[in-house]
């Protein structure tokens, strides 16, 4: 049974999957267009980071960055390769959306890659009501990025 808990960045299993996440993001994105957070970025006080487990097996992780009182950003969504297309990403995204709503946010945005590798991620986000939007926060237009946003006042996915 899957369980979502606050992420422990000192856990070697988490560090290992984070290394895979960062390496993959850099390999699948044009230079200068990867916006994945490293350990120090995930330790920022405006970031909440969660891991998802099945018993002692780490399945993935995700984070929520508070941009303002009403606006949050989905960050660092990653699911272990062997656990993709099994509901893991959906579970962590549901958790992030529910947490944003519970914290009074009205909008949730994200940046993901525009390359084919990121098609499944974009499909997951669309299935939860995210739609493409202009760059937000400190992002600038980038052909290697797709920006998406969700109105949290809409019905829960």
Give the positions of each predicted feature.
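Generic structural signal for conserved hydrophobic packing positions in ordered secondary structure
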Residues: 18, 74, 108-110, 118, ...
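Short low-complexity, flexible loop/linker segments enriched in glycine and/or proline
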Residues: 124-125, 148-150
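Acetyl-CoA-dependent GNAT
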Residues: 2-71, 75, 80, 93-94, ...
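Short hydrophobic/aromatic beta-strand or adjacent loop that forms the aromatic wall/cage
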Residues: 47, 143-147
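Conserved acetyl-CoA-binding loop-helix of GNAT-fold acetyltransferases
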Residues: 79, 85-98, 123-127
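Conserved GNAT acetyl-CoA-binding A-motif
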Residues: 100-113
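Conserved beta-strand-loop-alpha-helix junction that forms the acyl-donor binding cleft
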Residues: 110-121, 139-143
């Amino acid at each position: 049974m899957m369980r979502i808990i606050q992420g422990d960045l000192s856990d070697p299993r988490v560090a290992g999957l984070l290394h895979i996440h960062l390496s993959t993001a850099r390999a699948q994105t044009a230079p200068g267009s990867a916006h994945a957070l490293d350990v120090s970025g995930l330790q920022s006080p405006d970031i909440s980071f969660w891991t998802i487990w099945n018993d002692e097996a780490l399945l993935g992780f995700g984070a929520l960055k508070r941009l303002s009182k009403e606006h949050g950003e989905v960050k660092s969504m990653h699911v272990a390769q062997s656990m993709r297309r099994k509901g893991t990403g959906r579970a962590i995204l549901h958790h992030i959306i529910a947490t944003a709503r519970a914290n009074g946010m009205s909008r949730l945005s994200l940046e993901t890659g525009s390359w084919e590798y990121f098609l499944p991620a974009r499909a997951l986000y669309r299935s939860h009501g995210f739609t493409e939007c202009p760059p937000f926060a400190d992002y600038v237009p980038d052909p290697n990025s797709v920006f998406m946003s969700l109105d949290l006042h809409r019905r829960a996915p």
